[in-house]
């Protein structure tokens, strides 16, 4: 589940397929943080 801001089929924000994997991993970690905050209702 990556950001939909991109032209990649998977929806990741990578410029090239090489960077797609890195961007996807970074996005997943970021999403996990948001999910944890959401469960704790912080903010």
UniProtKB/Swiss-Prot annotation:
GO cellular component, one term: synaptic vesicle
Secreted keyword on record: yes
Chief subcellular location: secreted
Domain of life: Eukaryota
InterPro entries cross-referenced by the UniProt entry: Cystine-knot_cytokine, Nerve_growth_factor-like, Nerve_growth_factor-rel, Nerve_growth_factor_CS
Annotated GO biological process: cell surface receptor protein tyrosine kinase signaling pathway; modulation of chemical synaptic transmission; negative regulation of neuron apoptotic process; nerve development; nerve growth factor signaling pathway; neuron projection morphogenesis
Location(s), subcellular: Secreted
Protein keywords: Growth factor, Secreted
MF annotations from Gene Ontology: growth factor activity; nerve growth factor receptor binding
Family assignment from sequence similarity: Belongs to the NGF-beta family.
Biological role: Promotes the survival of neuronal populations that are all located either in the central nervous system or directly connected to it.
Name this polypeptide is given: Neurotrophic factor BDNF
Organism: Macrovipera lebetinus (Levantine viper)
Lineage of producing organism: Eukaryota, Metazoa, Chordata, Craniata, Vertebrata
């Amino acid at each position: 589940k990556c950001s939909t801001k991109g032209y990649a089929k998977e929806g990741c924000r990578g410029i090239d397929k090489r960077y797609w994997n890195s961007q996807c991993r970074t996005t997943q970690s970021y999403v996990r943080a948001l999910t944890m905050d959401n469960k704790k209702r912080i903010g």
